[in-house]
Amino acid sequence: MLDKIKALLQEVENMKAANAEELEALRIKYLSKKGEISALMNDFRNVAADQKREVGKYLNELKETTQSKINELKESFENVQTANDDIDLTRTAYPIELGTRHPLSLVKKEICDIFGRLGFSIAEGPEIEDDWHVFSSLNFAEDHPARDMQDTFFIQHNPDVLLRTHTSSVQTRVMEKQEPPIRIICPGRVYRNEAISYRAHCFFHQVEALYVDKNVSFADLKQALLFFAKEMFSPDTKIRLRPSYFPFTEPSAEMDISCNICGGKGCPFCKGTGWVEILGCGMVDPNVLENCGIDSKVYSGYALGMGIERITNLKYQVKDLRMFSENDVRFLRQFESAN
């Protein structure tokens, strides 16, 4: 009996069926009540007691292998049938989905192009920075709030290393390595320890500009800002500079533009003022120049910085900052015409 079971086991392992009808015939042959395996089960009672353990082992293996083989062949037929049913040769092909630039990439490119026409080149730097390039070289006091863990992401076990909070660190690296004249813009991602909401995020994107040369004045800065505003928004755009404070510039200012929604007449977007803030700027503090090895008695310069998300919000009236990082195709497709 053991030889017969082993022979059947070999036969089952090599079992094949061309279609569902042949498979059903094989199932009846082996697994039906009158099938060969059932017959062996009935004969098992006549096996000698000292052989039952070994014979029973092979008999169970035969039954399990047969059932598994039948199921495997059945599944293969079902998959083929499903695939054949799904094929419709008359159906129009799916359109190829073409990717487009992200709205932030569109605006960043536009900003870089505008300053490129003013002679600025692009400079980039690391997102993981040290305290010197992010804070100390830029005239931040030791007790400045920006150095707190509540505002900045520090690297664990190394308090001197952090995720940059602005791209000004790129400016200091360039000033350390390059002699004036320097005319650069620094686009990139920055990080702040802030709660995520419709108006704030733990990471966002900035573009900062730096111009250092002999006899650079605030008038040069103002003219560059006016050119940028008119090119970025519209030729009718007006600018307004308000005194402000930044550790790395003196004097410092914040720039507003006439609201591009209402044309400066006043609306809910500009809170009825007719003006919208877009960036900070100022003349580079002499201490910053000296920290980077540039003689502040010979050279002067201006710097400015803006959030790309902020400019994109103004240009396309996007009200929720989180939309830029959620990868919602319905939102992104609205910018296809701008590519």
Swiss-Prot record:
Cofactor(s) recorded in Swiss-Prot or TrEMBL: Mg(2+)
The keyword Nuclease belongs to this UniProt entry's keyword annotation: no
Residues that span the membrane, as ranges: none
Principal place of residence: cytoplasm
Lineage: Bacteria, Pseudomonadati, Bacteroidota, Bacteroidia, Bacteroidales
Naturally occurring in which organism (per UniProt): Parabacteroides distasonis (strain ATCC 8503 / DSM 20701 / CIP 104284 / JCM 5825 / NCTC 11152)
Record key words, sorted: Aminoacyl-tRNA synthetase, ATP-binding, Cytoplasm, Ligase, Magnesium, Metal-binding, Nucleotide-binding, Protein biosynthesis
GO cellular component: cytoplasm
Coiled coil: none
Pfam families reported in the protein's UniProt record: Phe_tRNA-synt_N (PF02912), tRNA-synt_2d (PF01409)
Catalytic activity: tRNA(Phe) + L-phenylalanine + ATP = L-phenylalanyl-tRNA(Phe) + AMP + diphosphate + H(+)
Gene: pheS
Protein name: Phenylalanine--tRNA ligase alpha subunit
Entry EC number(s): 6.1.1.20
